[in-house]
A protein has these predicted regions:
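Intracellular alpha-helical coupling/juxtamembrane segments of multi-pass membrane proteins
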Residues: 259-292, 296-302, 306-313
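ABC ATP-binding cassette signature C-motif
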Residues: 1-272, 316, 323-563
């Protein structure tokens, strides 16, 4: 359908949704969407973002108010846990997105075969009907570039790093299923594209490709995401969900940040912690690139200053306060000629790096490249095939993994954190356990939830809270930014900036990486790992000079060569 920026294609009139009596998740929302608009939805976890998408998609029927669609528009929806047919292969599922094109090609070939049959070529009326239908199909095929369908599918699957096309869907991980579902949906090209956390399980290169694709997308895009660069590059509107209300803001994320800060200044007599955090993020946004680079270099030389900062002052300033742990010596962790393979798949070979005492190292690269394996090797949970990791004598590691296996599902959030003690000893001071949990967005009621019923984002926040209270001086954080709302991300960034120690963070969140990292350890494909001193943006510039501007490809491995 042709773009029409004056055409309202969808409206919500007085929409409210409550999961419990007197507890509205969405409250009396009035919204209208124009064709071609790009809208990013933000808000705390539990604020109703996914529920709003489900209402628009027609999957959530139990609500008050009215939802009105203009006739003739199609809707496509990417759920956080999409349904895929387990009896099919990856390619068969992806091809569902182009089924009308496949049907047109199939019918075109059938018509060509009919031309050779006597019952058709001996009957002029039937031949005329075939020629007419063939012309109609030819128009469809030409308009959709259907003759190049296989190469288009291959490019899309490569760009999103989908698994091999012949792999059974039943064998895919959760992240692989999402990438396949996203690929199918983008090929489908609905008029309204509803995306629930589209950047989850995508690496930075695939996210960059997705951004460019959506910037050029003719239809309306409505995305729930915590990826602030995605919101900056794609969104023309921000819809903030706050205590049930839907507040629209014109502009991208940086524009929202500026408008939101001004509004909070007018509403608050004294500046809250959250407002100060927003103001500091806005200050970073306004910085010139060279000033940002200088900040990263200054951090590397400020270990003693950070270590000696007054704990009480830091705790009062920060929403998430990370205790420093014991003083680090000059030797932190050093990789010496490390190699690791699974079977004949070489993850990395001759890996060398030295972690700085006050550095924040961002670990980036495609899923399956070996990032989590690196952490498991450092922790001694797996063995290297060659080389060694040397760990300094003063190092005390706090490790946050993706599996969260050490969370007891039968205990409440409060019980897991407190261990039965009302006060936690952190940074040489007593900290109230409930107050500590509230910093990770666990309110009073949420603190009593059993861990077995927590969402992915809640488990991530809980595990982060568990690890950060251990007072390590080296933090290994595996995807701490997954399923975490923007407010918690912002608070975590500030906590890490003020942490006197070394942090190594696996993340695909480019804004997060850009704001806090002093170094980047990049898994670049073909078993190559590149260690770079500088911010994420500086690394990207360096990579462009070294490797050129290529579209993302699926992960490929070299074979392990034995002596």
């Amino acid at each position: 359908m042709a773009a029409d920026d004056k055409k309202i294609i969808f409206s919500m009139v007085g929409v409210s949704k409550a999961f419990q009596p007197n507890k509205n998740v969405l409250k009396d929302i009035y919204l209208s969407f124009f064709y071609g608009a790009k809208i990013g939805i933000i808000g705390l976890n539990g604020s109703g973002k996914s529920t709003l998408l489900k209402i628009i998609a027609g999957l959530e029927k139990s609500y008050q108010g009215e939802v009105v669609f203009s006739p003739g528009y199609s809707v496509g929806y990417l759920a956080q846990e999409p349904y895929l047919d387990n009896t099919k292969t990856v390619k068969e599922v992806v091809m569902e997105g182009v089924q009308p094109i496949v049907d047109a090609l199939t019918e075109y070939e059938e018509i060509n075969q009919k031309f050779a049959l006597p019952e058709y070529y001996e009957d002029q009326d039937k031949m005329d009907a075939l020629f007419t239908r063939q012309g109609e199909l030819q128009d469809i095929i030409d308009a959709t570039d259907a003759w190049n369908l296989d190469s288009k599918l291959e490019r899309a699957m490569d760009a999103l790093r989908c698994p091999p096309e012949d792999q059974p869907v039943a064998n895919l991980s959760g992240g692989e299923r999402r990438r396949v579902a996203l690929c199918r949906l983008l090929l489908q090209k609905p008029d309204i594209l509803l995306l629930d956390e589209p950047t989850n399980h995508l690496d930075a290169e695939s996210i960059d490709w997705l951004e460019q694709h959506l910037q050029q997308y003719e239809g309306t895009v409505i995305a729930v995401t915590h990826d602030r660069y995605f919101l900056d590059h794609v969104a023309g509107w921000i819809l903030e969900l706050d205590r049930g209300e839907g507040i629209p803001w014109k502009g991208n994320y940086s524009s929202w940040l500026e408008q939101k800060t001004k509004r909070m200044e007018m509403e608050e007599k004294t500046a809250s912690k959250r407002r100060k955090t927003l103001e500091r993020e806005l200050e970073w946004v306004r910085m010139a690139p060279k000033a940002r680079q200088a900040m990263g270099k200054a951090r590397l030389n400020s270990y003693d200053k950070l270590l000696n900062e007054d704990v009480k002052e830091k705790e009062e300033k920060l929403e998430i306060f990370i205790p420093n742990g014991p003083r680090l010596g000059n030797k932190v962790i050093e990789a010496k000629h490390v190699a690791k393979a699974y079977g004949d798949k070489l993850l990395f070979d001759d890996l060398n790096f030295m972690l700085p005492p006050n550095g924040i190292v961002g670990v980036i690269g495609p899923n399956g490249a070996g990032k989590t394996t690196l952490f498991r090797l450092i922790m001694g949970l797996e063995s290297v095939d060659k080389g060694e990791f040397e760990v300094g004598e003063t190092v005390k590691v706090a490790y946050v993994d993706q599996q969260h296996k050490d969370i007891d599902p039968n205990k409440s959030v409060y019980q897991v954190i407190s261990g039965g003690n009302e006060l936690l000893r952190m940074g040489g001071r007593d900290v109230n356990a409930r107050a500590y949990l509230s910093r990770f967005n666990f309110s009073g009621a949420d603190q009593e939830k059993l861990c077995g019923v927590l969402s992915g984002g809640e488990r991530n926040r809980l595990h982060l809270a568990m690890a950060l209270k251990e007072e390590g001086n080296v933090l290994l954080l595996d995807e701490p930014t997954n399923d975490i709302d923007v407010n918690t991300l912002r608070a975590l960034e500030e906590g890490l900036e003020d942490f006197a120690g070394c942090a190594v963070v696996i993340s695909h969140d480019r804004w997060f990486l850009d704001r806090i990292c002093t170094h980047i350890l990049a898994f670049e494909g073909d078993s190559n790992v590149f260690y770079f001193e500088g911010s994420y943006s500086e690394y990207e510039e360096n990579k462009l000079k070294r490797l050129g501007n290529e579209e993302p490809k699926r992960v490929r491995y070299r074979k392990l060569m034995t002596d």
